[in-house]
């Protein structure tokens, strides 16, 4: 084998001066002249043969050592006896150096008649042979990490070889060839030792995490890695931290370097460093890492049509980028980006897809039926090749697979050789490197369970056969290793064109979900029931596309949820749907209130299923809509406003008994606040008109939906005429908008656990989801959209048409105005329309603008009068965040807060100051300078009444009040959902 016949540079470097003659002493010593003369007549005989083979070095050394100590027969006696019994000549290395550093097995040469040679070889091998139990494993380790694995002076790899009893060979060619580097590392030894050495090598690999530190440079120099705080993090978590200034721009790249066998500490240290350097921005800064994978393996690892990588990205949440094959410089570097947990997990899964080759010898007289080989390949997800060795009476067996399937490779060897055991136990191969945290067994493999074994990698045949036949029920993860068909490699000819081969058995163990969920949920705070609902879990047994942001599968039902330390165990049972699964709305039942209450220490409020959590909510009629968009708040800190919201809702119930179903957190399909559920969805898309609704419910269910929709429509028409309900509904909406603004402006507390909920779902308060984007999404869903800016005549006709049909208002219109869609006219009296140009009409327009704004601060100016000095009158005693919120510059608030710049200091800034702060966008600087100019000019008028005449720049083009046009998929591209 190559690894045994070619000396590695490590082994060569370790050889001592006394072993320079080792090669000669390993070679057989020729017989005496008398022996050669006696054998001369037989040299030309047709029956004469000569065979050269290797014997186990350790056993031969032990034989010579025992003879030297007088405890056994010497090598001379052993070979002489065989020569006499078989009438052969045997040449063996009698001068073998005992205890030499060389691990190479010496050769024995036997000469004589063919039958005699065969008999002599059997006698020798019965004592000195271990080749039948010796294997060679070839694995991929990036050449850039070889020195890290070897260690200083070879100390790391020496210890691995001593502990495992294996010889590990690194490629010699890397020292001289600068263009092409080999990543292949060979391990030779006993199966258990080889597998243990493979896992140990993976643990020795470096783990490097990087992130970009924003806003450094002039005002904030690059942090010093020698500061006490950073040194404390470095020493506590055994990592090294370095900073590199980015050229031509602000910011710095932070690199955290640790070891794979210390993964948890590296992740914790990186999180601590992020928190220390970035503060509240830590959660928004992505972390990246990279893997060096040989370019020839990229297509294999990506899978057919990239299915393998897509599944890993969908499962972990990390972004994976393979380089352009035409790029000569970085053609082997794969980039990963995401959260700390997702990046590390995706890295593990990618390394589990690296190719692995197991080689061993088989006796020549062993014959294996090709059908048996094919069955083994299908069952064990491996490729098997058996070839005769030239000039040797044995066969060479090659087994190929991927690293996450290493155990099955040894299982294939056991079956081929007819052994009782594979020689490798599960405990031997388990390590943090070989098995990601949370997987109790290598067979619990998300890639294989999703049909992404070697078939999914695009190189296997069309047939599949499951090794596991237990019919356990479907779970969130089909976690057992579904088997696939044989891998076609270059050694077996051209690969046969195959179709996608989905797994036959989607089986899962009882612990399939309970051992996995924390892989996708980084902490207990994000593993609440609401977050599971919002995550929209697709079926992994099929290649179902991930749902658009805010859409959740219809048939996902939550049964129970238990908290055990930091791990969340849950069982999600439901119908596993094919790729065309439907997604339905997320009902705003009291689940949200239960989750909210549990976060504030209320022991009576336990998170439970829908049936126990919402005794007041109506039955399954709450899921009739086809789609609903969910707007998530930008800063979901509810500790400061949850009590206020619940108190407000309680007061609403006391003041109006008929509003018992109007509560935001208990609103269902029949609630009076139907606009809460449907604010961002098509108001006309009822159960009787939606094509998806017809597909959802067969027969009687469809009739029940129609009846519920009709009842709801009549109820809303009746309630729309009641001024009490109208005022309460408007009051609720405005109060909730104010509370939402306070929640977004509230500074997060480091020690506070912040849990996303659906409290503000569907109300359009989110700063990260502009109103214009929502309108574009509604337009994409075939909802008619009327522009907000109309001419005087269009506005007049619109007002008249709205006031002429009360029924139209009650049933909900396609207007962009929230009041009109919910049957609320200006001041509750929509039947009286004001004449064109009258103050009443202007007031109505301002109210429409107020309730159509994307957040509370955007709409304040509309309530101060058209002639008022909006900017100054709205910000009496206000602070800088509110001003930026009004100007649409909210994303720069953190920059100014970090530099401790308040409103008074802001008024003194110049264009150059803004540039030094990192405000590089011209439009943003222009808005800020205009605001500074306007506020400075009118500082004396800040406390004048609102009707003081002054010109507000916000009413002009600089304010950005004109409707902005967004691409329909801007929200998905921005990644801020």
Curated annotation (Swiss-Prot):
In the adult, predominantly expressed in heart and kidney. In 8 week old mice, expressed in growing primary oocytes and in the stromal cells of the theca. Residues 794-803 have a biased composition (Low complexity). Residues 134-201, 286-350 form the KH domain. Residues 590-621 have a biased composition (Polar residues). Its main location: cytoplasm. Residues 1-43, 590-622, 667-702, 794-848 are annotated as: Disordered. GO terms for cellular component: cytoplasm. One of its GO terms (biological process) is determination of left/right symmetry. It holds the Pfam family KH_1. The modification Phosphoserine is found at residues 27, 32, 45, 614, 681. Residues 875-938 form the SAM domain. It comes from the Eukaryota. The modification N6-acetyllysine is found at residue 400. Keywords: Acetylation, Cytoplasm, Developmental protein, Phosphoprotein, Repeat, RNA-binding. One of its GO terms (molecular function) is RNA binding. Coiled coil: none annotated. The keyword Repeat applies. Transmembrane segments: none annotated. PROSITE patterns: KH_TYPE_1, SAM_DOMAIN. It is found in: Cytoplasm. Residues 692-702 have a biased composition (Basic and acidic residues). PANTHER family: PROTEIN BICAUDAL C HOMOLOG 1, SCP160. Belongs to the BicC family. Interacts (via KH domains) with ANKS6 (via SAM domain) in an RNA-dependent manner. Interacts with ANKS3. This is Protein bicaudal C homolog 1. The gene is Bicc1.
């Amino acid at each position: 084998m190559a690894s045994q016949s070619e000396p590695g540079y490590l082994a060569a470097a370790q050889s001592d001066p006394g072993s320079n003659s080792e090669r000669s002493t390993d070679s057989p010593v020729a017989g005496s002249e008398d022996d050669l003369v006696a054998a001369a007549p037989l040299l030309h005989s047709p029956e004469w043969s000569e065979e050269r083979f290797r014997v186990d070095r350790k056993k031969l050394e032990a034989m010579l050592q025992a003879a030297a100590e007088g405890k056994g027969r010497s090598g001379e006696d052993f070979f002489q006896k065989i020569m006499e019994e078989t009438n052969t000549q045997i040449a063996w290395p009698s001068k073998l150096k005992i205890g030499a550093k060389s691990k190479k097995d010496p050769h024995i040469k036997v000469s004589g008649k063919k039958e005699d040679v065969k008999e002599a070889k059997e006698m020798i091998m019965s004592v000195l042979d271990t080749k039948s139990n010796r294997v060679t494993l070839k694995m991929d380790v990036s050449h850039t990490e070889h020195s890290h694995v070897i260690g200083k002076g070879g100390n790391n790899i020496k210890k691995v070889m001593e502990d495992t009893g294996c010889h590990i060979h690194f490629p010699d060619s890397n020292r001289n060839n600068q263009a092409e580097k080999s990543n292949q590392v060979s391990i030779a030894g006993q199966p258990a030792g080889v597998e243990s050495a493979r896992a140990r090598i993976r643990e020795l690999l470096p783990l490097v995490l990087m992130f970009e530190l924003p806003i450094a440079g002039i005002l904030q120099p690059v942090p010093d890695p020698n500061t006490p705080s950073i040194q404390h993090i470095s020493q506590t978590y055994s990592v090294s931290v370095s900073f590199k200034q980015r050229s031509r721009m602000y910011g710095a790249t932070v690199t955290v370097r640790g070891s794979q066998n210390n993964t948890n500490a590296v992740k914790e240290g990186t999180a601590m460093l992020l928190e220390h350097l970035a503060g509240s921005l830590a959660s928004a800064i992505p972390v990246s890492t990279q893997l060096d994978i040989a370019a020839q393996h990229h297509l294999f690892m990506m899978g057919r049509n990239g299915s393998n990588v897509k599944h890993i990205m969908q499962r972990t949440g990390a972004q994976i980028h393979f380089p352009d094959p035409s790029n000569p410089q970085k053609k082997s570097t794969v980039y990963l980006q995401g959260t700390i947990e997702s990046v590390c997990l995706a890295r593990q899964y990618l390394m589990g897809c690296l190719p692995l080759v197991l080689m061993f010898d088989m006796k020549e007289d062993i014959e294996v039926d090709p059908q048996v080989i094919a069955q083994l390949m299908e069952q064990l997800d491996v490729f098997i090749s058996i070839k005769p060795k030239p000039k040797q009476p044995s066969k060479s067996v090659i087994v190929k697979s991927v690293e996450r399937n290493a155990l099955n490779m040894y299982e294939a060897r056991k079956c081929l050789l007819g052994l009782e055991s594979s020689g490798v136990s599960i405990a031997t191969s388990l390590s943090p490197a070989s098995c990601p945290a949370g997987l109790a067994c290598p067979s619990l493999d998300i890639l294989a369970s999703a049909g992404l074994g070697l078939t999914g990698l695009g190189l296997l045949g069309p047939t599949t056969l499951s090794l596991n036949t237990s019919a356990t029920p479907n779970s969130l993860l089909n976690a057992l290793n579904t088997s696939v068909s044989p891998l076609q490699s270059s050694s077996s000819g051209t690969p046969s064109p195959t179709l996608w081969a989905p797994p036959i058995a989607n089986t899962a163990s009882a612990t399939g979900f309970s051992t996995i969920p924390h892989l996708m949920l980084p902490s207990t705070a994000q593993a609440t029931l609401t977050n599971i609902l919002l995550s929209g879990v697709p079926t992994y047994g099929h290649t179902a596309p991930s749902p658009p942001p805010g859409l959740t599968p219809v048939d996902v039902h939550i049964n129970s949820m238990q908290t055990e330390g930091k791990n969340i165990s849950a069982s999600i049972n439901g119908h596993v749907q094919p790729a065309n699964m439907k997604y339905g709305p997320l009902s705003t039942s009291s689940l949200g209130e239960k989750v909210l209450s549990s976060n504030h220490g209320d022991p009576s409020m336990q998170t439970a299923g829908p049936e126990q959590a919402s005794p007041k909510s109506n039955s399954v009629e709450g899921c009739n809509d086809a789609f609903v968009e969910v707007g998530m708040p930008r800063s979901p800190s509810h500790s400061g406003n949850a009590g206020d919201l619940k108190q407000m809702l309680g007061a609403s119930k006391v003041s109006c008994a008929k509003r018992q179903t109007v509560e935001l957190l208990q609103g269902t399909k029949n609630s009076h606040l139907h606009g809460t559920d449907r604010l961002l969805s098509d108001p006309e898309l009822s159960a009787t008109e939606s094509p998806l609704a017809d597909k959802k419910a067969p027969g009687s269910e469809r009739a029940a939906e129609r009846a519920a929709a009709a009842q709801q429509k009549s109820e809303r028409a009746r309630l729309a005429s009641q001024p009490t309900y109208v005022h309460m509904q408007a009051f609720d909406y405005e109060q909730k908008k104010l509370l939402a603004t306070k929640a977004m402006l509230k500074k997060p507390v480091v020690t506070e656990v912040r849990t996303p909920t659906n409290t503000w779902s569907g109300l359009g308060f989110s700063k990260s989801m502009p109103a214009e984007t929502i309108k574009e999404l509604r337009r994409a869903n075939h909802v008619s959209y009327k522009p907000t800016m109309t001419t005087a005549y269009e506005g007049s006709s619109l007002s008249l048409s709205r006031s002429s049909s009360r029924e139209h208002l009650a049933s909900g219109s396609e207007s962009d105005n929230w009041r009109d869609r919910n049957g609320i006219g200006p001041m509750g009296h929509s039947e009286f329309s004001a004449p064109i140009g009258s103050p009443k009409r202007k007031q109505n327009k301002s109210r429409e603008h107020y309730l159509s704004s994307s957040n509370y601060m955007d709409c304040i100016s509309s309530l101060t009068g058209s002639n008022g000095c909006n900017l100054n009158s709205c910000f009496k005693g206000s602070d800088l965040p509110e001003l930026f919120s009004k100007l649409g510059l909210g994303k720069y608030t953190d920059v100014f807060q970090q530099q401790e710049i308040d409103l008074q200091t802001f008024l003194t800034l110049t264009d150059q100051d803004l540039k030094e702060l990192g405000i590089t966008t011209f439009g943003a600087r222009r808005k800020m300078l205009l605001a500074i100019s306007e506020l400075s000019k009118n500082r004396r008028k800040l406390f004048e009444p609102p009707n003081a005449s002054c010109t507000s720049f916000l009413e002009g083009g600089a304010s950005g009040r004109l409707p902005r046009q967004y691409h329909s998929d801007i929200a998905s591209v921005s990644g801020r959902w």
